[in-house]
Regions:
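Cytosolic juxtamembrane N-terminal segments of multi-pass membrane proteins
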Residues: 1-28
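Alpha-helical transmembrane spans
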Residues: 19-82
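Structural detector for short beta-strands of small beta-barrel domains
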Residues: 80-98
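SH3/SH3-like beta-barrel fold
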Residues: 101-105
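Beta-strand/loop nucleic-acid-binding surfaces
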Residues: 109-122
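A membrane-cytosol interface segment of integral membrane proteins
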Residues: 123-153
Length: 153
């Protein structure tokens, strides 16, 4: 029987970063392109002084578009990292494929039996970990636990 362990902030941030990985990739990519666009704009305006105004206008437009994209991805990442509707976040580790797990709250109360359908490595170079959300009622619902199939036990 596994006991639920409360996640510390560092683990929680790592997991949420994993969860919104796609937004993070785009955010990093576009935020790194902005200085490159600024440098290219300045170099191009220096090399072709006759077209400097047009080059500056294009550079400003592209940079503004990139800033808007970076801001929108950042906003989406922050919205994913906000506190979930389920008040408690716990981790069960290690978890193996097809392992039947009985969950126990930190207060010692037994929860439903759960069967691990899939197992994924959330943290690189660490053991398998399963993140679950447990509401105050103590019931684990499938919509909150993507990797668990509830078994009434």
């Amino acid at each position: 029987m596994y006991e639920l362990k409360k996640l510390n902030l560092k683990q929680s941030e790592k997991y949420m970063t994993y969860k919104c990985n796609e937004y993070g990739k785009h955010y990093k990519k576009f935020s790194r392109i902005i200085p490159v666009v600024v440098i290219i704009t300045l170099v191009a305006a220096f090399l072709v002084p006759a077209q400097a105004k047009v080059i500056y206008a294009l550079g400003v437009a592209i940079t503004a578009g990139l800033f808007f994209m970076v801001y929108s991805y950042y906003k989406q990442m922050v919205s994913l990292k906000e506190v979930p509707s389920i008040p408690c976040e716990y981790v069960v580790t290690p978890v193996k494929y097809n392992e039947r797990v009985q969950l126990k709250t930190t207060k010692g109360e037994d929860l439903l039996f759960a069967f691990v359908e899939k197992s994924r490595s959330i943290y690189k170079n660490e053991k398998e970990a399963l993140i679950i959300y447990v509401p105050e009622s103590g019931h684990v619902y499938g919509e909150h636990v993507a990797l668990l199939k509830d078994i009434k036990g």
